Amino acid sequence: MTKRALISVSDKSGIIDFAKELKNLGWDIISTGGTKVALDNAGVETIAIDDVTGFPEMMDGRVKTLHPNIHGGLLARRDVDSHLQAAKDNNIELIDLVVVNLYPFKETILRPDVTYDLAVENIDIGGPSMLRSAAKNHASVTVVVDPADYATVLGELADAGQTTFETRQRLAAKVFRHIAAYDALIAEYFTAQVGEAKPEKLTITYDLKQAMRYGENPQQDADFYQKALPTDYSIASAKQLNGKELSFNNIRDVDAAIRIIRDFKDRPTVVALKHMNPCGIGQADDIETAWDYAYEADPVSIFGGIVVLNREVDAATAKKMHPIFLEIIIAPSYSEEALAILTNKKKNLRILELPFDAQAASEVEAEYTGVVGGLLVQNQDVVAENPSDWQVVTDRQPTEQEATALEFAWKAIKYVKSNGIIITNDHMTLGLGAGQTNRVGSVKIAIEQAKDHLDGAVLASDAFFPFADNIEEVAAAGVKAIIQPGGSVRDQDSIDAANKHGLTMIFTGVRHFRH
């Protein structure tokens, strides 16, 4: 009995050669619509789908393969006599191979001019149905959704006249993943259209971007997946211009770096980062000076660190960066001379280019945190804060220089691991206490790091001070201005201590925990 294949693809890459080889192996080919036209034009004889169903395509192609003659031919178990008899009684011929890929829904909704009606029309119905039927019956039917599998299937058919069960099972698994991802994109699109913020089912889909050598530690396996609907301002979309492949820890650090730099749009700014904590932030009227400040903030910790700049890297800045051992540099662009300088004898230095003009769109994405047995979902900590809404709670008002420095410090503290304390002036960080289990410990670490640069410095805390002992430490160090959320039941104790020492203190009313 001649074996039959059903071919209906939107991605026609490789399909002509594949179909010709099938014909050479003695297969009959059923086809539909544009695929049939393409095969016929290439000289590949095909059977029209309506010759199989006895029913014409209708409703602009919405109904053409949803028919018992198709699904019966796919679902009939070859090892069950009653199935074969039912097929015979109803003149259903068996289909042994299905090659289908789906309407380009993803590509359609990514078009800037897409309309709702166009998106709906690109939801495939018949394709997923055929794929599911064939994949369910993979004991007998080979199903192909990816052109990358054409060669394997043809090779096995040529060698043995059929594919192996292991191949059919693997291809079926790929099909179910493909359909699930396709449906997840449709669900994501419609969920966004109706503005559903808390869906009862969360369906998200990601594509494998990079198989990694290992994870956070060598004993951990890891891979990097990219959102199926890409985010332009993201590590997944960054263009790598030089260097080794990014590691698991590199990717997490870069993600933290490009989040931090989003908050410093107004002036040229450089952020140096280690282990997802900023170790130096500098801003100035030009990017070279901003680099100087970021480097001077902590010339020890920057060694082996990540650096992100929010302006084009010029030659002067590149010359200063080149002697420093850095893991990664990220910027919106690089001058030709700067790139030549940075890559000179630095084949391992990872240099990334990222479209900073797409930052705003990245801020609306949800954050996902895996826990054992579940997933936490929250929006990003990107609340718009207006300094005019902040409250000076002490007798002394901040000076103009202090006010500028406090605003700078408040931007920086958002990205320090809690309990987080940062000491800055109006253009660079000076000391940082991160990740301590008590706040006064973070205060002491930040003061120790900044001890030679405390004149005119200010201090920011990511959460309220629970006790006045923190204020006492700050005052003893000579810091004269503090910014914090407030909200402790002992706020008045802290205010009294600040007044006693002549400090100025601002309450923002917004906490910035970062675990």
UniProtKB/Swiss-Prot annotation:
Pathway: Purine metabolism; IMP biosynthesis via de novo pathway; 5-formamido-1-(5-phospho-D-ribosyl)imidazole-4-carboxamide from 5-amino-1-(5-phospho-D-ribosyl)imidazole-4-carboxamide (10-formyl THF route): step 1/1; Purine metabolism; IMP biosynthesis via de novo pathway; IMP from 5-formamido-1-(5-phospho-D-ribosyl)imidazole-4-carboxamide: step 1/1. GO terms for biological process: 'de novo' IMP biosynthetic process. SUPFAM superfamilies: Cytidine deaminase-like, Methylglyoxal synthase-like. GO terms for cellular component: cytosol. Gene3D superfamilies: 3.40.140.20, Methylglyoxal synthase-like domain (3.40.50.1380). Keywords: Hydrolase, Multifunctional enzyme, Purine biosynthesis, Transferase. InterPro entries: AICAR_Tfase_dup_dom_sf, Cytidine_deaminase-like, MGS-like_dom, MGS-like_dom_sf, PurH-like. It catalyses: (6R)-10-formyltetrahydrofolate + 5-amino-1-(5-phospho-beta-D-ribosyl)imidazole-4-carboxamide = 5-formamido-1-(5-phospho-D-ribosyl)imidazole-4-carboxamide + (6S)-5,6,7,8-tetrahydrofolate; IMP + H2O = 5-formamido-1-(5-phospho-D-ribosyl)imidazole-4-carboxamide. Pfam families: AICARFT_IMPCHas, MGS. One of its GO terms (molecular function) is phosphoribosylaminoimidazolecarboxamide formyltransferase activity. Residues 1-145 form the MGS-like domain. Its EC number is 2.1.2.3, 3.5.4.10. Belongs to the PurH family. The IMP cyclohydrolase activity resides in the N-terminal region. PANTHER family: BIFUNCTIONAL PURINE BIOSYNTHESIS PROTEIN ATIC, BIFUNCTIONAL PURINE BIOSYNTHESIS PROTEIN PURH. This is Bifunctional purine biosynthesis protein PurH. It comes from Streptococcus pyogenes serotype M6 (strain ATCC BAA-946 / MGAS10394).
